[in-house]
Amino acid sequence: LPPEKAPTYRDRAIFSDLDQSLLGDREALPEFAEFLRRNERTVTFGIATGRTFGSALAVMRKYGIPRPDVLISGLGTRIHYRTVLSEDRAWTDHIDHDWSRPRIERLLRDEPGLKLQPQGRQNEFKLSYFYDPELAKPVDGLVDLLHRNELTANVINSFGQFIDIIPARASKGLALRWVALRLGIPLEHILVAGGSGADEDLMRGNALAVVVANRHGEELSDLVDVERVYFARAPYARGILEAVDHYDFLGKGAGDPADTVPESGTSPS
C-alpha cells in the first residue's frame, strides 16, 4: 500500500526505540511480538532508532523483532513503510532543505574531541562522531560554531560520548509527526517508547509516551512532570506492555487527557 493510504481500521500505533527500549530483555520479546500479532488489525507498529536502516534491520532479525509497518532510522533522517519497506522520498526531500553535509564535515574536521564514527554508522543526512567532552566544545558551542558559519542543523549528544548532526528539519519527533499525518493517526492515539536522552524530542508533544526502566532512564528525568509521559517500573519490552495497560491503550479512552496523566509520585527507576 502507498504510505498515505493506510487501512482505516488501524487507528492507533506504537513506536519504540530499539537499543534502549526493546533490546536488553530477550525473554520479554516473544511476549511483545505476540501482543503485536494479536492486535495487528488495529495497531500499527513502528521503530524509531538512531541506527542506520541496514543496522536496524540486522538487529531486528537477530532478536526476532517483527518487521515494523514503519521504520524511522538514522535519528529521523529516513522513513520506510510497510513490509517491503519502501522509502518516503518526500521526507528526504523535505529535510534536505538547507542541509550541507560536506560543509559541516569540513568545518569540524580539525575540531578537538571529535572523531568520525565508522562509515556504517553514517548516512547522507546523519554525520556521526565519537565525542570527548574533556577536549571538545560543549554542544552549545558546536551549535554556535555552525551558526557562525551559516549552517543550520540539529546537534544531538547521546550518552555523553556520541554526537550526531542531522538536518534542522529532521529528528525522531519530527519524523513521527510526519508519519502520523501520512497515516491519518492522531498523535493522541500513538504510544512512543524511549529509554535515553536521544528519545526526548520523540516523547514531547501530544503522543502518549513511556520511559522504560533501564540504566539510561535518568537521562529523561526532566520529563517526570510532563503530562502523557509515564515512567514504567518494568524494563524494556515489558515496560512498553506496562504502559499499554496504564493508558488503557487498546480501549476507547486512549489519548483521553483524563486518563493519561502519569501516576502521582511516579519517578524514573
Regions found by a protein language model. Give the residues of each.
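Mg2+-dependent phosphoryl-transfer enzymes with acidic/Ser/Thr/Gly-rich catalytic loops
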Residues: P3-Y9, I166, G173-S269
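Asp-based phosphoryl-transfer active-site loop
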Residues: P7-E27, M203
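The start of beta-strands in P-loop NTPase/AAA+ ATPase cores
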Residues: D11-I14, D69, I190
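Short, flexible loop segments at the rims of nucleotide/cofactor-binding pockets, characterized by
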Residues: S21-D25, A48-G50, A168-R169
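Active-site phosphate-binding/coordination module
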Residues: P30-Q119, N214
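A generic structural signal for alpha->beta connector loops
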Residues: T42, P68, G113, E150-T152, ...
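Conserved acidic, metal-coordinating active-site core of Asp-based
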Residues: P102-G205
